[in-house]
């Protein structure tokens, strides 16, 4: 993965009593985009997660409101620069252009969560082969993002090692019998686990 780094940035803007305009919000977003990052990091997202005007909290959209000071909490997400460049280079070699970069867990959350889940709060877990990414949503905004270098391949590998079977058979067992939800499975149930190096099993052995 791109090793996402997630943090909340507070951006203040002096209003001088005038109404908040779209131009003001654009200035705030530009400031978050220009936030100094480490040399090996690349900016991915700058997403507003909360607005305040003169200490007033809970504002969903400040446009048209008056005040002296606007405070915007921005969720800034960055990724590993070298990994992102390798991905864009790979896309370029396929004679395709990269229009925009989107964190996979963020895209998965927007695609799979319903409006109430985004508003009330939910965590989207996107498990790939080697990386599992998460995105935390609340109040219709992504509040946090992270990733761990563990995925479905590691589960398959553990099954293969634990049952002394091949990776191919372990993947099949995971697909047919695996579940992330605990259930009352009869402990007397048996499944066929082909021994490592043997293709024909005489009967259920686990």
Per-region residue spans from a language model:
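A short acidic Gly-Thr/Ser loop motif
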Residues: 1, 124-131, 137-140, 149-153
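Nucleotide/phosphate-binding catalytic cleft detector across ATP-hydrolyzing
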Residues: 1-123, 142-143, 165-168, 172-206
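Residue-level detector of high-confidence beta-strand sites
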Residues: 145-147
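A conserved active-site cap/scaffold subdomain adjacent to cofactor or substrate pockets
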Residues: 149-169
């Amino acid at each position: 993965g791109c090793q996402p780094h997630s943090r909340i940035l507070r951006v203040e803007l002096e209003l001088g009593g005038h109404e908040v305009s779209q131009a003001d919000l654009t200035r705030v977003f530009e400031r978050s985009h220009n936030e100094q990052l480490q040399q090996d990091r690349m900016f991915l997202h700058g997403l507003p997660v909360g607005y305040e005007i003169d200490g007033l909290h809970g504002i969903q959209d400040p446009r048209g409101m008056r005040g002296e000071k606007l405070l915007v909490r921005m969720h800034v997400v960055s990724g590993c620069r070298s990994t992102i460049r390798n991905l864009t280079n790979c896309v370029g070699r396929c004679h395709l252009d990269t229009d925009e970069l989107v964190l996979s867990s963020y895209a998965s959350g927007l695609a799979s969560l319903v409006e109430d889940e985004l508003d009330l709060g939910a965590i989207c877990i996107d498990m790939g082969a080697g990386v599992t990414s998460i995105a935390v949503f609340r109040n219709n905004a992504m509040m946090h993002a992270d990733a761990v270098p563990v995925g479905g391949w590691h589960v398959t590998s553990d099954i293969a090692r634990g049952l002394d079977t091949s990776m191919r058979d372990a993947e099949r067992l995971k697909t047919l019998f695996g579940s992330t939800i605990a259930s009352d499975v009869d402990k007397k149930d048996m499944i066929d686990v082909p021994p490592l190096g043997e293709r024909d099993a005489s009967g259920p052995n686990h």
